[in-house]
Each structure stands twice: as C-alpha cells, then as structure tokens.
Amino acid sequence: MSGGYSNGFALLVVLFILLIIVGAAYIY
C-alpha cells in the first residue's frame, strides 16, 4: 500500500520536474 503511494508520488514528481525543464527550454 505504502509502496504504491510512494511510486505514484515519485512519478508525479518526475512529471513535474520534466514540465519545468521543458518550460525552461521553451522560454530560453
């Protein structure tokens, strides 16, 4: 149960970081 929650949270963090990187690359 905790493992699935941790996995989902990690995926959310990765997607968020990816969005920031893509956004920065688009701005610059």
Curated annotation (Swiss-Prot):
It is found in: Spore coat; Membrane. Disruption phenotype: Spores of the null mutant show partial lack of assembly of several coat components, including CotB, CotG and CotH, and impairment of response during germination. The chain crosses the membrane at residues 8-28. It is a single-pass membrane protein. Induction: Expression is regulated by the mother cell-specific transcription factors sigma K and GerE. One of its GO terms (biological process) is sporulation resulting in formation of a cellular spore. InterPro entries: YjcZ-like. Signal peptide: none annotated. Pfam families: YjcZ_2 (PF09680). NCBIfam families: tiny_TM_bacill (TIGR01732). Spore protein involved in the assembly of several components of the spore coat, including CotB, CotG and CotH, and in spore germination. Belongs to the SscA family. This is Small spore coat assembly protein A. It comes from Bacillus subtilis (strain 168). The lineage of its organism: Bacteria, Bacillati, Bacillota, Bacilli, Bacillales.
